[in-house]
UniProtKB/Swiss-Prot annotation:
Lineage: superkingdom: Bacteria
Protein family according to the UniProt entry: Belongs to the V-ATPase E subunit family.
Alphabetized SUPFAM superfamilies for the sequence: F1F0 ATP synthase subunit B, membrane domain, V-type ATPase subunit E-like
Organismal lineage: Bacteria, Bacillati, Bacillota, Clostridia, Eubacteriales
Name assigned to this protein: V-type proton ATPase subunit E
Gene Ontology CC: proton-transporting two-sector ATPase complex, catalytic domain
GO molecular function (one): ATP binding
Function of the protein: Produces ATP from ADP in the presence of a proton gradient across the membrane.
Amino acid sequence: MSNLENLTSKIIEDANKEAEKLLSEAKKEENEIVDEKVKKANKAKEQIIEKTKREAKTKAERVISNTHLKVRNNKLEAKQEMINKVFDEAVIKLQNLPQEEYLNFIKNSILSLDIEGDEEIIVSSNDKDKIDISFMLTLNNKLKDKGKKELLKISNENRDIKGGFILYKNGIEINNSFEALVDSLRDELEQEIIEALFS
């Protein structure tokens, strides 16, 4: 073989070796890049899964918390409804007092107040006919016995109240309607009613 052939053969052989080496390095680099991308993709996937789990947990906790809040609010509303019903029933019982008891209530309530004795008694239109002249004379005599004026009179005005009365004089009112009396006791009695109903 001639030197030229040897040289050509050597160049081709070296070129083939260099090509194989370059291909091998390229393949290795490709594998490293692919491995790195796979690692990054797996890490990103894990982060996405972890983030999704956290978000799902947070959302679930929020839903549970909102549900607990709604249940608690519903219970409170139901309790408040029952308490309101108790107070409404108290007003109804007062409305259904026999006439004699009702008039005694009005008389005793008025006599217990620090009044001058020349006020007007405002009642509902339903109660206007229950209070007659005889009742007013008796009431005014009792006021006189206490050293008060005996000028108490029934007002021509009616009020939309469920019972009881309102005393009026010079723009000042003392509200002794059944609703006002029950409401005035509400704060005092509400805790007792809650304990009686829900214990």
